[in-house]
Amino acid sequence: MARVFRRECHRVLDSERTTIQGADGMLMVPQLAIAGVNKQERGDFGVALSEVLAVWKYFLLDKLQLSHKDIPLPQSYDLIRKEYDCFLKRTNTVDLIDVFSMFKELRLNEDPEEPLTTMQMFQFLFGENESSEKPSQPVCPATPSCKAADCSPQIQRVVRRVFCSYLDLLVNSKNDLALTYTLDNPNRSLGHTAFTDLRHAACDSASSLFLTVTSFVRAIQLGGKGYAPPESHPLRKHVKGLSEFLNFVDQCQDILGETPNPREAGCKLVSSIRAALVKGRSAGDPVYLAAEESTKSLKERIGQIHAMHTQSTVGTGISPARPKAYAINHATAYGGRETVKVLMALLDEEALALPCRNKAELLSEDHAALNGSTGACLLALYKSPEAPTGSSPKSLRNRVLSQQEHIKSKVVRPTIRSQFACTYKEEELPLNRVLEFPSTSQIPTCVHPAPKKASSESDNGMDNRFKEATNLRCEGPGQSALGEHSGNAWNQTGGKSTQPEPLRRATGTLKRKLANRECTEQGREENQPPQKRPPAKAATGGPGKRNNKAVSKKLIAGQGKLTGFFRL
């Protein structure tokens, strides 16, 4: 059925790269459609599992044109069906029911009859024949296997879906569901917020998710300053992760176009995806085991499909014709054309695989085991994060983190200080130092001078302090007037360097005060620059004294001749 559809689909479809949604994908798309309708009607993007299963059963009966009189019509079924059809058309995909319907129209006389009836197709999709096909459990349990225990069926299913989604994205770049599974697998820090921003940007530009990523990253890489997206663009904060994702897809496309052998190209693609998924994981990791198993099975199946295509081409005895205009990519590029055929056949077989038995597990499973983060199911990933309000506050952890970030943003970064930064403390700014002004009755012991006083009493006090300091300086070591309790005694034999530092600074300050007062008395202002000192008198003895010293130097033997020779 899928082989006939793939051979004749150019007669009914616009694109030959249309891919098929399997049974599991057909169940996930109605879930998103129902949640979207509930968002429009109730304002909440969500849906119950029972509602999904009820709509799913009615939808299958309605699309297969079976009787559904005993089943009530779900609420807003017309809108849900419209959303479902729009999603398939927008992503360039068809479901199994469409393939089943097209097979009746597209098959030729030499093709086999219908492999399934309509009721069998319904039972296959809805899962009513699972109980009869399910193998019975053995009475005695088998020996427990470490590999089976570590690698659960859920992880195997998720890992294999990621492999097929990467291959699907190479064939059909419009498949948004394939990009959803591959965007953050492996972990690229593109979580819920990044996917929401990407989805909103795609809605604004009316394009697919992959085309939005490609346009944004290419505009930054090749557009230059004038054509690059503005800094306010919502995808600007996810540039690193989006660039990593697009670079990996570019590497896969290079393998697809540069490797002529389809089998070799397919094996290289699968190996590249495996290397990306198992990077940084140990050999006993469940994801590592599932990736190894998926890689082995996919490589074997790619080799078998390539052998089948080769036999069908060579067995006719006729050389293959030139590529037709409608084949694969409308004759735009023939590189990797045969490889794309093999990948499409592989994806068609994956779409015809048995659906998942546990529908609840399928709709609620997440990818946290793959990317190492708090992943979410497909429904929660498509749900836009709501702004916190009074009725729905943030969690305590988020509030604490936001408060810490707010405090960190207010901390003033240390500025570049001068070479005198050692004179003030680290936590204080240079201009915020405290100036201490001692009273006029105390001897100034701080670095900063005391404020100027305009009264004559302060001048008299300064004169008295200067005289006291002078008297103390003139006294000998045995004539200390203040005694040891004052702390102002010093040894006269030590000279100026042995004087206490506070008293020496105070003496210099008082000398400057006296000089300023003398200048004021002579009619000059205090701020007037000081007069230049008169030039020193010339040294006695005449100018010839220095020349005589220079002439008195004796020459070495032969120095005069050598000097005259070099002067010439």
UniProtKB/Swiss-Prot annotation:
Residues 442-555 are annotated as: Disordered. Gene3D superfamilies: PCRA, domain 4. GO terms for biological process: DNA repair; negative regulation of double-strand break repair via homologous recombination. The keyword Metal-binding does not apply. GO terms for molecular function: DNA binding. Residues 488-500 have a biased composition (Polar residues). Its main location: cytoplasm. This is PCNA-interacting partner. The lineage of its organism: Eukaryota, Metazoa, Chordata, Craniata, Vertebrata.
